[in-house]
Amino acid sequence: MRMRKKPWARPELESCNFFIVNPKENKGKWKESFNNENPIYLELGCGKGVFVAVHGSNNENINYIAIDIKDEVLGLAKRNIEKAYKEKNKELNNIKLMAQEIGLINEMLDENDKISRIYINFCNPWPKKKHKKRRLTHTRQLTQYRNFLKENGEIWFKTDDDELFEESLEYFKEGKFRIEYITYDLHTSGFEGNVQTEHERMFTEQGIKTKFLIAIKED
């Protein structure tokens, strides 16, 4: 189902002090943008922002870059992030929100940004063979991520899709990533520190298991 147009979204985003209108201008300078040397985590496809809002408000010593493509969803993410910080009475200074096509992620990040962790949560599985190169875990994308992931940087990947998960294991191997942790049922695995996304809650209620892995960049 397509999200309805939200005429308020773009003006509200542009007046928001943590929304980056032109992320390309910060390429290689994201630590300067945050004005500190804290680790930077990147969420690809942040949706309505629930995941990054929880992470950011719970981890003030980590910086977060949250990316999606549509103003409508980013507008909701902006509001959810603000709400989470307000409820905890915390200052919002460790999240940057922006619109960016993930296939062109190298236009806004490079090796000087030294991203410590990437989150990929319930991305489009692109099941048709002709579309598989669009997957966010495809080897073509992993090659881009390697450019700005620091040494031993991590990718945390969650999905409900069995085929995507199995084929992603091969992508990570081809892309020179080591699988550090894997489970085919995250919610019964005993793994600590999981933050559920909107999709994750929905799938869990439907009895669909969440597959999860942590991949480490190898030289």
UniProtKB/Swiss-Prot annotation:
Disulphide bond pairs: none
Residue sites binding S-adenosyl-L-methionine per the record: E43, D68, E101, N124
One term under GO cellular component: tRNA methyltransferase complex
Positions bound to substrate: K128, D160
Pfam families associated with the record: Methyltransf_4
Molecular function GO labels: tRNA (guanine(46)-N7)-methyltransferase activity
Pathway info: tRNA modification; N(7)-methylguanine-tRNA biosynthesis
Catalytic activity: guanosine(46) in tRNA + S-adenosyl-L-methionine = N(7)-methylguanosine(46) in tRNA + S-adenosyl-L-homocysteine
EC number: 2.1.1.33
Keywords: Methyltransferase, S-adenosyl-L-methionine, Transferase, tRNA processing
InterPro entries: SAM-dependent_MTases_sf, tRNA_(Gua-N-7)_MeTrfase_Trmb, tRNA_methyltr_TrmB_bact
Coiled-coil stretches: none
Family note: Belongs to the class I-like SAM-binding methyltransferase superfamily. TrmB family.
The protein's role, per its UniProt record: Catalyzes the formation of N(7)-methylguanine at position 46 (m7G46) in tRNA.
NCBIfam families, per the entry: PRK00121.2-2, tRNA (guanosine(46)-N7)-methyltransferase TrmB
Protein name: tRNA (guanine-N(7)-)-methyltransferase
Organism this protein belongs to: Clostridium botulinum (strain Alaska E43 / Type E3)
